[in-house]
């Protein structure tokens, strides 16, 4: 996993996205979500541009979102196939992953 990845949250209330960036790269990876309620988000999409492929950005973004959920007492419904596949590989995420 790339330790230089930085993360941001763009939260517009009922929807938003988690953004990952690499130094020296103007592209952004994202994981978009909608908020079902105060303690439940639905992640519906993960996008990693070609310029970031193979650098562990998608996996790091998934782990970041899980960490965010734990810190905030939030659960995640992974409609996004990528996040669902990552959750299946990480049973230790079951405390925040629903479905």
Label each residue range with its predicted role.
Residues 46-53:
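A short, internal acetyl-CoA/4′-phosphopantetheine-binding micro-motif in the GNAT/acyltransferase core
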Residues 64-99:
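C-terminal structural segments of small proteins and small subunits
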Residues 54-67:
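Conserved acetyl-CoA-binding loop-helix of GNAT-fold acetyltransferases
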Residues 2-40:
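N-terminal first-folded block
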């Amino acid at each position: 996993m790339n330790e230089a990845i930085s993360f941001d949250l763009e939260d517009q209330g009922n929807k938003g996205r988690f953004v990952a960036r690499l130094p020296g790269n103007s592209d952004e990876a994202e994981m978009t979500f909608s908020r079902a309620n105060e303690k439940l988000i639905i992640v519906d999409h993960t996008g990693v541009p070609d310029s970031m492929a193979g650098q562990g950005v998608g996996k790091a973004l998934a782990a970041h979102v899980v960490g965010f959920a734990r810190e905030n007492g939030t659960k995640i419904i992974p409609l996004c196939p990528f996040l669902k596949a990552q959750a299946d590989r990480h049973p230790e995420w079951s405390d925040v992953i629903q479905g």
